[in-house]
């Protein structure tokens, strides 16, 4: 196993414990990121469906708005200059909210009316009813455009976040976790090899001690046997071998 396939650590019990904790953390992180990716993908598909639905509705509304504008111009004439002269500020304004999906912040755009309606009484003039209808249809189109912009912004944001999250999930699953597992295997093999070497060394030491003990016991037995043989082989002196006895007088 090359050093590139595993983490470069010194094989020890402490390193084994640390790698096990690291593996557990990586597996937990992988699980959390996987759940996050699933939640984001689900919301992504929901937004995609809403975008398709809104675009379809937008096409119908714009078609209706175009016909309404044509009808209003046919009856009331060209009122573009009058509208431009009476505009002082935007009546439809936009504010932004934030939506949180699995830790990802998505902007949400909403429209609201600011001030009174300048053309509230337009319906009383010539062709005013058609102009009011045209205004309502185009107002609906603006609201749909804002909603579509909000959905597409969320769509792009989620698409980028999902790609990043999936890359992280794949990196943890196919690179980090296998690398930690190979490191654990390497440490376990090294520790087992050390234990076998230590067991063999202790076994040899015990065998050597047994041999030395047996040799000492044998030497002790031989020494004791020699001492016994010396005692049994020592000559017994008789009265004839004692040359210094005093003469006896009768």
Curated annotation (Swiss-Prot):
One of its GO terms (molecular function) is proton-transporting ATPase activity, rotational mechanism. It holds the Pfam family ATP-synt_D. Keywords: Hydrogen ion transport, Ion transport, Transport. InterPro entries: V_ATPase_D. It comes from the Eukaryota. V-ATPase is a heteromultimeric enzyme made up of two complexes: the ATP-hydrolytic V1 complex and the proton translocation V0 complex. The V1 complex consists of three catalytic AB heterodimers that form a heterohexamer, three peripheral stalks each consisting of EG heterodimers, one central rotor including subunits D and F, and the regulatory subunits C and H. The proton translocation complex V0 consists of the proton transport subunit a, a ring of proteolipid subunits c9c'', rotary subunit d, subunits e and f, and two accessory subunits ATP6AP1/Ac45 and ATP6AP2/PRR. Belongs to the V-ATPase D subunit family. Subunit of the V1 complex of vacuolar(H+)-ATPase (V-ATPase), a multisubunit enzyme composed of a peripheral complex (V1) that hydrolyzes ATP and a membrane integral complex (V0) that translocates protons. V-ATPase is responsible for acidifying and maintaining the pH of intracellular compartments and in some cell types, is targeted to the plasma membrane, where it is responsible for acidifying the extracellular environment. This is V-type proton ATPase subunit D. It comes from Suberites domuncula (Sponge). The gene is VATPD.
